[in-house]
Amino acid sequence: MLSNLLILPMLLPFLCALILVFLKNNDRISKYLYLGTMTITTIISLMLLIYVQRHRPITLDFGGWTAPFGIQFLGDSLSLIMVTTASFVITLIMAYGFGRGEHKANRYHLPSFILFLSVGVIGSFLTSDLFNLYVMFEIMLLASFVLITLGQSVEQLRAAIIYVVLNIIGSWLFLLGIGLLYKTVGTLNFSHIAMRLNDMGDNRTVTMISLIFLVAFSAKAALVLFMWLPKAYAVLNTELAALFAALMTKVGAYALIRFFTLLFDQHNGLIHPLLVTMAAITMVIGAIGVIAYKDIKKIAAYQVIISIGFIILGLGTNTFAGINGAIFYLVNDIVVKTLLFFIIGSLVYITGYRQYQYLNGLAKKEPFFGVAFIIMIFAIGGVPPFSGFPGKVLIFQGALQNGNYIGLALMIITSLIAMYSLFRILFYMYFGDKDGEEVHFKKIPQYRKGILSILVVVVIAIGIAAPVLLKITNDATELNTNDQLYQKLVNSHLKGEE
């Protein structure tokens, strides 16, 4: 009975999105409906996470067809901490846009497609079937393309074309990898794939397939292949930019973690050094980006790229500490990047400018944003006791254990550069007053300050309550780095199947 609840975090947003299509003339009911739906989804996800922590992973086989023949959802520590965090930030993002007045012609479509996007995101985290993961990625791609183009501006259409072309290439490679892997092992279920690959040992065909998946997921995660990201994020309104920054690249990073710990770990002689190299390139180019631009929305976009480099560096160390740190930082970064883009969007709204030199001492008149920005900088920089600290320490530890001193040095340097670029913005927030000029700032709605306050509190709480979250990420790391334990806890009925 409990396993049936596993479908609800995906089913509820899907049903709500369909209902909203017929409620476009009743704005108030629609708003309370989608906020209520995502709140309930978050609560259910949290309840499932607590159960899994106290007992064991949950599986749901659809239509009575057991894995590996049927579609299966898996609720383990990794998938459910991701679903819970994603549901939480989606709720806040939709609440942030509650009173938005621009794009009136499209405002009725916006919540529906955000919910469809959340279906793809949550489904990607829950599925333990490779083809179903592909389907969820395509749902995300379709919904995200619509969201990028809703404003119908030339800039949005240009960004959408770049975004879609690169993601379609990634999808083609993903589908090619699925076909080759199925031909090789004869199954698409994660647990069954792990069993078959273990029996095969090192194999050139499997190595080639793993490289195809690496490129496909790198396009989704903006790992090296990030050309679409800065342009796409820069043209989005605040809540959509926060949504994309918090979740889109994180789904790709999640897939990389799941694949290259559980499925293709035996081929780490090639894959993991390649992951470290790609992470290093991503961190360096991200650091160049945050220094090169004065546009605060583009600076925020390159901050996302740097954080992806951190996460994949942890995965590439192929150590328990590094992978644990990657998972912790991945979860934390969903919250922190939501906060970053909310603050950046608020600064643009208040001042009317995207260049930091026009912030005109805003923090003196709006001290709330100054304090929130400082806390966010410390969280991104990994300063104790803020939320970025535990994940970065574990990634540092993993890099040391692996002997990857270049990756470790690059992580330290790019972390400092990332903080410097944000402190540069903060400087103008406090000391950018223009003598003799009267500056007029727009007032931001109080409820949006309330949402920002919630995120600030959560960022602080993650740092303080790190031992609780580390227990979850420890369990997730142990399960995904021990394929025999994974098979025993998740799909013990597969033993002996051909």
From Swiss-Prot:
Protein keywords: Antiport, Cell membrane, Ion transport, Membrane, Transmembrane, Transmembrane helix, Transport
GO biological process, one term: ATP synthesis coupled electron transport
Mode of membrane association: Multi-pass membrane protein
UniProt xrefs under InterPro entries: CPA3_Na-H_Antiporter_D (IPR050586), NADH_UbQ_OxRdtase (IPR003918), ND/Mrp_TM (IPR001750)
GO molecular function: antiporter activity; NADH dehydrogenase (ubiquinone) activity
Transmembrane segments: 2-22, 32-52, 78-98, 108-128, 130-150, 161-181, 209-229, 240-260, 271-291, 308-328, 330-350, 368-388, 403-423, 450-470
Coiled coil spans: none
Family: Belongs to the CPA3 antiporters (TC 2.A.63) subunit D family.
Subunit structure of this chain's protein: May form a heterooligomeric complex that consists of seven subunits: mnhA2, mnhB2, mnhC2, mnhD2, mnhE2, mnhF2 and mnhG2.
Name the record gives this protein: Putative antiporter subunit mnhD2
Annotated organism of origin: Staphylococcus aureus (strain MRSA252)
